[in-house]
């Protein structure tokens, strides 16, 4: 279910403050965040966020195509190692 339009997108307040400060100072340093739930807004275009995936921080450079998505969508939390059977089939043939 989508968020109500009258409420607007959710963004943690400290991220908004850091984005405004980075734009004002024209700083290219990545913004470190644990807030995977925050929605990407147009003010964030051109900034880099280090998004925590539970183990490490993944750099996410925000472009215009990312608007409306959550920061966490670009920092995967799980690594897929492949299915066990597919490797054995290749070796057996």
Swiss-Prot record:
The UniProt entry's GO biological process terms, in alphabetical order, are: ribosomal small subunit assembly; translation
Name any GO cellular component annotation.
cytoplasm
Q: Which UniProt keywords apply?
A: Ribonucleoprotein, Ribosomal protein, RNA-binding, rRNA-binding
Looking up SUPFAM superfamilies in the UniProt record yields: Ribosomal protein S19
Q: Say which family it is in.
A: Belongs to the universal ribosomal protein uS19 family.
What job does the chain carry out? Protein S19 forms a complex with S13 that binds strongly to the 16S ribosomal RNA.
Protein name (Swiss-Prot/TrEMBL): Small ribosomal subunit protein uS19
Organism, by scientific name, is Campylobacter hominis (strain ATCC BAA-381 / DSM 21671 / CCUG 45161 / LMG 19568 / NCTC 13146 / CH001A)
- Gene symbol? rpsS
């Amino acid at each position: 279910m989508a968020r109500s339009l009258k409420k607007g997108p959710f963004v943690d307040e400290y991220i908004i403050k850091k984005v405004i400060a980075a734009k004002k100072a024209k700083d290219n340093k990545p913004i470190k965040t644990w807030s995977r739930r925050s929605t990407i807004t147009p003010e964030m275009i051109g900034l880099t966020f280090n998004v925590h995936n539970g183990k490490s921080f993944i750099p996410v450079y925000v472009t215009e195509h990312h608007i409306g998505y959550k920061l966490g969508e670009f920092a995967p939390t799980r690594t897929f190692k492949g299915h066990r059977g597919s490797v054995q089939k290749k070796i057996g043939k």
